[in-house]
Amino acid sequence: MEDKTRVHVFVSGDLDGTHFVNSVAEKATEQGVTGWVKELSDGRIEAVLEGPRDEVYRVVGLCRAGPNGARVAGVQVDREPPRNEKTFKVK
């Protein structure tokens, strides 16, 4: 049985114009991770990632590094109980 993990992530920094949301969505889909991602009105990125632990943390790694052009200042990662998300979406 796979070890399912769910994390709630907030990314801050100079992220505008970097396609951060789409990069997270693409990486999550590639890794088979479910959940969602969105840009908040204050410029931060918020995401919920759920799936096998290793795959979830690969997406968290992208959040820490950011896509080209992003200057990530901070990443907050909080674990949550899995909720059996079925898809990944951009909100």
Per-segment meaning from a language model:
Residues 1-91:
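Intrinsically disordered, low-complexity, mixed-charge
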